[in-house]
A protein has these predicted regions:
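Single conserved hydrophobic/aromatic residue that forms the stacking wall/gate
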Residues: 1-15
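PLP-dependent enzyme catalytic core of the Aspartate aminotransferase-like
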Residues: 27-33, 346, 359-389
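A glycine-/small-polar-enriched, mobile loop at the entrance of the PLP active site in fold-type I
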Residues: 32-83
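Active-site phosphate-binding strand-loop segment of PLP-dependent enzymes
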Residues: 39, 139, 150-206
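Conserved N-terminal alpha-helix of the aminotransferase class I/II PLP-enzyme fold
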Residues: 62-108, 115, 130, 138
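PLP-dependent aminotransferase-like
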Residues: 106-174
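Active-site C-terminal subdomain of aminotransferase-like
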Residues: 223-304, 318, 387-389
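Conserved PLP-binding catalytic core of the aspartate aminotransferase-like
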Residues: 313-344
Length: 389
């Protein structure tokens, strides 16, 4: 029996009680829900337990990762291990820099044109949802940003067909959002942009399946969906793209500065990078990105098959462009949608409400969502349909 509390007890710290025992053991009755949030999202339970066990004393250092200096030897090993694992899992070539930054994916909307719209002062954008739309609007502040294709005409329910002839030959880069979190669409094929550098926001499909990094000049994403808690943004940039930022580029938005400093120009989000390392170790243990893709396809198929055969629920995306990560769906009634969300929450299926701009429902089934969670959702949807038909 644990006789002292976790908070405010020097004895607990000095005696080095196992935090995992305090949190997960004893008489504490845990009740974990299935969290379908688009982000921040579920983390693997194995990762949470590992982090809990190391909370007070990381590998005999006598301190939490939250407390240690980002320039200490022990933390240097954490961030270097995270980068090594990411490079191995994604097969990132040596001529690409990996940056662990702050500011979220949204900050990159400005950083990208400031760093890369530096030749013709032109950039081509494909608008497939709110995040691509926001990135495009930001780029327009800095140069000749052009929307070369859009799926806004059908509420972003599909990915436009692209041909390299659509892109301006002198554009400094082409920009896409690989997976559209709100609308549930994804590029199943990487666009052919010829010699024009391709940049992609992969926030909501990061590490969900293999991707050919060499097809891109830059990949980036917020970590709070598939990689870690909120607070970390990972950028993967081909080295030849660096070093030509505009003179007006703020220091903290200059990728070359962060690359030269190995992501330590200022204090990084240390604990979030540590959790990222644990998640990468978890993915490696499962068998890498090919195995992760198999897991994700199995989960998505279960949910899409139900939607395709339901008389009450229907998906909102054309089948050929469906995302493995984000599955939006609706009924024919706003009242029924609201009732479904309320009852699902009571049954431990939380954060199924669709984005405020589109309504309905959305199940985000990222890497950490187990098959059992999707199965429970589908069973609940089936029961709900029978009870409300």
């Amino acid at each position: 029996e644990i006789s002292c509390s976790l908070v405010g007890s020097e004895m607990c710290i000095r005696d080095r009680y196992n935090v995992a025992e305090i949190i997960f053991g004893g008489n504490i009755n845990m009740s974990r829900v299935y969290n379908f949030s688009a982000g921040p999202s579920m983390l693997p339970e194995e990762v949470l337990k590992k982090a809990a066990s190391e909370m007070l004393d990381y590998e005999g250092s006598g301190q939490s990762v939250m407390e240690m200096s980002h320039r200490s030897k022990v933390y240097d090993n954490i961030i270097k291990t995270a980068e090594r694992l990411l490079r191995e899992l994604m097969n990132i070539p040596d001529n690409y820099k990996v940056l662990f930054l702050q500011g979220g994916a949204s900050t990159q909307f400005a950083a990208i044109p400031l760093n890369f719209m530096n030749g013709s002062n032109k950039a081509d954008y494909v608008i497939t949802g709110q995040w691509a739309k926001k990135a495009f609007a930001e780029a327009q502040k800095y140069g000749d940003a052009k929307a070369v294709a859009s799926s806004a005409d059908k509420t972003f329910s599909y990915i436009p067909k692209l041909d390299k002839s659509m892109f301006r030959s002198d554009a400094d880069y082409v920009y896409i959002c690989m997976n559209n979190t709100i609308y549930g669409t994804v590029y199943h094929e990487i666009p052919d942009t010829g010699d024009i550098p391709l940049i992609a926001d992969i926030s909501s499909c990061f590490l969900s399946e293999p991707i050919d990094v060499t097809k891109f000049a830059m990949l980036y994403g917020g970590a709070q969906k598939n990689v870690a808690p909120a607070g970390l943004t990972i950028c993967i940039i081909r080295e030849d793209m660096l070093g030509n930022a505009r003179d007006i580029t703020p220091t903290m938005l200059n990728y070359k500065i962060h690359a030269d400093a190995n992501s330590l120009y200022n204090t990084p989000p240390c604990y979030t990078i540590y959790i990222c390392k644990l998640v990468l170790e978890w993915i490696e243990k499962l068998g890498g990105l090919e195995k992760m893709k198999e897991r994700n396809e199995k989960k998505a198929k279960l949910l899409y098959d139900f939607l395709d055969n339901s008389k009450m629920f229907r998906g909102t995306v054309v089948p050929e462009d469906r995302s493995l990560m984000n599955v939006p769906f609706v009924t024919d009634s706003d009242e029924l949608n609201a009732k479904f969300i309320e009852e699902a929450t009571k049954n431990g299926l939380v954060n199924l409400k669709g984005h405020r701009t589109v309504g309905g429902m959305r199940a985000s089934i990222y890497n950490a969502m187990p098959y059992d969670g999707v199965e429970k959702l589908v069973n609940f949807m089936s029961d709900f349909e029978k009870a409300n038909s």
